[in-house]
Amino acid sequence: MSSTPDHRPSKVSKELANAACDDFKRKAIDEAKKRAVAQRVDYDTFKNMVLTAHLKPITAPKQLNNDRPLPCWSFGVDGKMLKEQISQSQLPPTTPTEVPTTSGDFTRDWRRNCPTPDDKYRYLKLCGPEGLQAVFRVEISAEVLREMLAVLEACWLGHGGVAEEAEGGAGAALLEAAFVVQVLEAVSTAGRFSLTVKLLGSSAKPTLERLFSGLQSAVLASQAAHQGKQEQPAAAEAPHEEGGSTVDPCSPTRVAALQAMYGLPPS
């Protein structure tokens, strides 16, 4: 009496396949770690390289050479393809008009609706220091903080100069410097901020140095304004009077404390 052979995979073959898969994944992760260390990437990039090391790259499917004409409904009345018309008629990003209530809302508007540094800077002005402090009460990611520092460094002097020209040199640049100091202080109250600063990486250090160099210049200008005409200090302290504080935001003590908080040595 003959019995039919059992073609089901044995338990041993399954274990061998799983072991081979685990060995491949372990080798891929080790190679990704070595490659990340050699490239000296920051923590976020290192984590992403390790997590995706075992994944195979997605390749685009091969397009078949089809010489047949497209059907008439693929074209619009102007002769262009409908897909091209749809892509050209996409609405531009919507400018945010409301203060976000969560870090997720902030990040979505920051990335999606603020494409340029000037748009991002105006979004920071919309949120204000108090709004940013509330949004990032739990924590702020190193990537968002790095982008925020780059926007502040690139835009605050330009916005201050434009305001100076519009107001006839009424201390508007000092107001912008005060706003930057208040934003940096508000963000620094986030949870685990010291760890976030460590995760910024060396790429953010030049940005921080340029930003605080400009703030140090604002400190000198603020001191000169206090020693000179009386109307300039009043203009420089106006935003803090609204918030219930009469302390000059561009004081050397506050800027030096911020500089240490963001990991820079005292200048």
Curated annotation (Swiss-Prot):
Q: What keywords were assigned to this record?
A: Cell projection, Cilium, Cilium biogenesis/degradation, Cytoplasm, Flagellum
Q: Does the keyword Transport apply?
A: no
Q: Classify the main location.
A: cytoplasm
A GO molecular function for this record?
Answer: protein homodimerization activity
Q: Name one GO cellular component term.
A: motile cilium
Give the family per the record: Belongs to the DNAAF19/PR46b family.
Which protein are we looking at? Dynein axonemal assembly factor 19 homolog
What is the phylogenetic placement of the source species in the record? Answer: Eukaryota, Viridiplantae, Chlorophyta, core chlorophytes, Chlorophyceae
Q: Which gene encodes it?
A: PR46b
